[in-house]
Structure formats: structure tokens, C-alpha cells
Regions:
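N-terminal [4Fe-4S]-dependent radical SAM core
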Residues: 43-115, 137
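Core AdoMet radical
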Residues: 113-126, 135-145
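Generic alpha-helical secondary structure signal
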Residues: 9, 28, 62-66, 78, ...
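Well-ordered, non-membrane alpha-helical segments in soluble/globular domains
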Residues: 85-89, 124-131
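Serine/threonine-rich low-complexity intrinsically disordered regions
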Residues: 4-7, 25, 102, 118-124
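Long terminal accessory regions outside catalytic cores
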Residues: 1-55
């Protein structure tokens, strides 16, 4: 538990710095965050994911590069920090570790992300809240709505 709190605090500090760097110089900040992201993850999935992202974002003519640069420039700093923390730490680190642990100890296989159709009649607010709560218990921290 203390280890998770320490890792969480370190991730928040790192993300705060990275977001400030991206806001001040988006091109340089994007390169730095991807280079840094390749150092941090220990799992094969995370390393592969960040290698792909690095390759995509190294092409300044890429639509993804333009999108990320626009997000970095136009999205509120606090929202960008929260979003980055949720994807980077909660989903890729903490959640992935919990999914792996649950698979090893209970034989449960949980997805890394869940897509929710909010327009479907059976997916009312209470159902979605329950799904997210149950998903978090399994290590799922990324929801596509």
C-alpha cells in the first residue's frame, strides 16, 4: 500500500513537470515525454505501446502528431494533467499490474479497457457507475464512452 502511494506521488510529480514542459514547448515536450515513457515502463505491453506511440509522434506530418500538439496547446493544464495521469499511471501502470495479479492469483482475465455505448438504453448512469466500479476492482481504468 505504501509502495503504491509512493509510486502514485512520483507519477503525479513527473506528470506535472511533463505537462508544464509540453505547455511551454509542445514539440520538445512531446519528444521528451515519449523518450521518458520508454524508460519508465517495465512490462512488455507498456514498452511496445510507447514504442508505437514514439514512432507515430516522431512524424510531424502525422495526424496524430497534429492532434496531440493541438491538445497540448488548447486543453486546460489541470485537465491535461488528470487525463495524462489516468492513462499513464492508472491504466498503464497500476491497472495493468492489478490485471496481471488477478490473472495470476484468481485466473481472471480482464480487458485493459472497456467500451461503453452510453446511448444504449440498458446503459443508464447507475449501470455505467456500477460497471466502472467493478472494472476498477479488476484493474480496468480506461473506459471509452
Amino acid at each position: 500500500m505504501a509502495r503504491d502511494r509512493l509510486a502514485r506521488a512520483m507519477a503525479e510529480t513527473l506528470i506535472n513537470k511533463v505537462v508544464i514542459d509540453i505547455k511551454s514547448d509542445p514539440e520538445r515536450g512531446l519528444r521528451n515525454i515519449i523518450d521518458l515513457a520508454l524508460i519508465v515502463p517495465r512490462g512488455k505491453f507498456s514498452r511496445n505501446l510507447f514504442s508505437i506511440v514514439q514512432r507515430i509522434l516522431s512524424d510531424e506530418d502525422s495526424a496524430y502528431y497534429t492532434l496531440v500538439k493541438s491538445v497540448a496547446s488548447d486543453v486546460d493544464t489541470e485537465i491535461l494533467k488528470k487525463f495524462t495521469f489516468n492513462i499513464g499511471y492508472n491504466s498503464c501502470a497500476y491497472g495493468a499490474r492489478l490485471i496481471k495479479s488477478n490473472k495470476e492469483t484468481m485466473g481472471l482475465t480482464a480487458p485493459w479497457s472497456i467500451a461503453i455505448n452510453s446511448a444504449a438504453s440498458e446503459n443508464d448512469a447507475d449501470t455505467i457507475k456500477k460497471l466502472i466500479s467493478e472494472g476498477k476492482d479488476l484493474g480496468v481504468y480506461l473506459y471509452l464512452i
